[in-house]
C-alpha cells in the first residue's frame, strides 16, 4: 500500500513493476560475462574527484560538453547487462547497457553519469522500461558540490529539461555511461552467495551472489582470523562477503569472505542470508552492547520517581486503553476519551516517552540510532531497543504508571472539527490492553444496543473504570474516526489496499498456515488518530523549528507509469473513467473500480497502481534541497502539506528525534513557544541529515527483509502443501514466462512456459499466446518450435484450454507451490497454469 494507509503504524510498499515484453535473465548468475565488443576492451579508469569537479566547473558546453550528472545506479535483476539511472528531469531512467558502459558500478552505487547526446538515444521498445524509477525531486547536485546549473555553466538543468522533452516527444530511451563511483553501495559490504569453483584460472574460488543484481566475484585468500573455507565447496555453501576491489582490467571484482552461513538447503540458513544481504546482521546483533544496557534503570520493578514526574501533566485518572494485535508486546500508543459536555468531546493520543529513557548522546542512543528500526520477520522481531525498554519500561502496560507524550484535542462531536489542542509530556495509567477483535466486536454492535466488551477483553484488576465505559468510549471514538477518515479522503488522501500476507505460527515461531491479514474498522479507528497526531505534530515542529525538524515526504508517482495504468483499465472496458491526475482522483477511481470489477481484478489493478509509487522519505527541513522549496515537503498519498512520524518511538528512531524536537519547542502550557529562526549549527544539521539518510536506508532494508521472510516461509509451506487459487496476470517476459498475482495471499508468482509439456508460446502486440506444440505457428513463418528439455517440474496443460491468449489482467486458476531454484539450492514461490474462464 502507498503510505496513505500504513504510515501511521507500519505501512509498507510492495514490489517492482513488470511489463509486457522484455527478455529473461542475461548472462546467468552474477555479472561476470566480459566487457562486450569485438575486442572486449576493459572500461576506462574512473575519473578522479578533481577531474570530475573540473568537468563540472569548466563544462561550458553543458551536458553536450561532457558534464556528468549524479545519479543512483540500479541493475535489472532479470538481465544484469541492463543498468538504469533515474534522472528527475528525464521521462525515463537512463539505460546503461553492457559491462563496459556500466564501468564496474554495483547495484545501489551513486555514480557520475555521462549522458549520450539525444541523437544517439534509441526508440523505446515494448517492455523496455524495466528500470527502477527513482523519486523526483530537486535537480541532482553536481560532483563539485555546485548545483547542476552552476556546474554546466548556468544551462545544465535547462538543458536536461530540454533533453527530457525531446525524449518524451519522440519516445526515446536516454542512454549513458558511468564515469565514476561517487558513493559505493552498502551492498558491497554485505554480499551473500554460494561458494563455487570457477571454470577458469586454476579453479579459483568464486562467489555467486544470491542477488542477481550483484556481480560474480573472485574470492580472495583467507586473511588473519577470517573464516576457514573448504578446499572443495559443495556448491550449496552460503557465505557472506565484502567486495574489496574491482580494477578496470579485471573481469571479476575481488571479494573477501567474512562469514560462513551454512547449507542453503536449510531454511534457517536462507533466513540468515536475507538478514545478511540487507546489512541487518551487522546493525541488529542478538545482544545489545554492555555500555548501552548500562544506560537502563537498575533492574527490578520500576516506578517513576518525583524527578521523573516533574513538569508532566498527570493523566493517570483518565480512562486510557490500548488497541493492538493479540501478539503485541511493545505497546507504544494508547487512546483516551471523555465526554466534556453535550457535543464536546476530549480525545487523547498517548505515546510512550522513549526519549526519557534514551538520553541524547548516550551509548543507548547511539545503538538505537544505528539500528534505527525494529525488524519484523515471521515468528521473530529484531528490536531497535533492549527488550526491557520495549516490553516493560516504555510499553504502556495496563495498570502500571507509564511516562508518555500526549496530544489531546477537544473535538466537535457533530463535525469532527478540532476546537482546542494540547501537547506535552504526561504520566498515564492504562486501564486495559484490548485487541482489534475486541474493538471490532463493539463497533459491530447494533446502534440501539448498549455497548459492551466481549469475553476475553480484560481490564487491569485494580482499574476504577468499568467495561461498559470503555466499550462506550470505543463506540464514540469510532464515530469521530469515521468523520476524520471521510474528511481525509474528501481532501485527497489515497490508500492502496494491497493484501498483506500473514502467518499463524506455533509457539516456536514456525508457520502453520498462511492467509491475508484482514484490516477492519477497528484498525482504521486507531489509524485515524495516529495519522492526526503525526500530522499535528509535524505542523508544530515545522513551524517552530524550521531548520532542524524531521518530517516525512512522499513524492508524486511517475506520471508516465500511472498513465499506463489508466490506459490498461480503459482497454478492459470497465465502466467509468480511471483517472490518476491527483491522489484524490486516483482514490476515487480505485473506489469505483472496486465497486464494479471482480475482487481479484480490482486487487490486481491496485497492485499495478502501487508500482509507479515512490517511497516516502525522512528529511530535515533545513537541508539545502528542501529549505527553499516547501512544495517538496508534501506527502502525496496522504495529501498532507506536513507529515512526520511521532507515534512509534519504540520501533522507529526518527520518532525519538521528533519527540526531542517537540519537547524543545513546547511551553509549559503545551503550546509552541514563539518561533526562533536562527540558522541551525552546521554540525547539528549534518547530524540530522545523516540520521534521516540512515533511517531511510534501514527502513528499506527492514521492509526488504520482512518481504523476504514472508516469501521464504510461504515457499517452504507450499513445498509441502500446494494451493489451487484464482490469479490475475500482471506481467510477462516475452514467450518465456508470465507473472500472476494471487489476491488470497497477496503474492506474485511466476509461471514458466518451459514447464508446460507439449505447449508452444508466441508473443505479439502485447499478448502472450499458448498453443499445442503441433499447432501451426501464429506469429512468424518458419519460427522454430521450442524444444522440451528434461524438466522435473514439467506438467501437461489441459488441452481444452488451448489455444489460449493472455493479456494483462487475464483471470486464471493456478497451483502455487514451492519450487527449487538455483539448481535445487533454494526454494521460491512458483505457479502452474490450471485453467482459465
Residue map of PLM features:
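Electropositive polyanion-binding surfaces
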Residues: 225, 235, 245-249, 263, ...
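Charge-lined substrate channels and their catalytic hotspots, especially those that engage the 3′ end
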Residues: 2-351, 355-401, 433, 450-454, ...
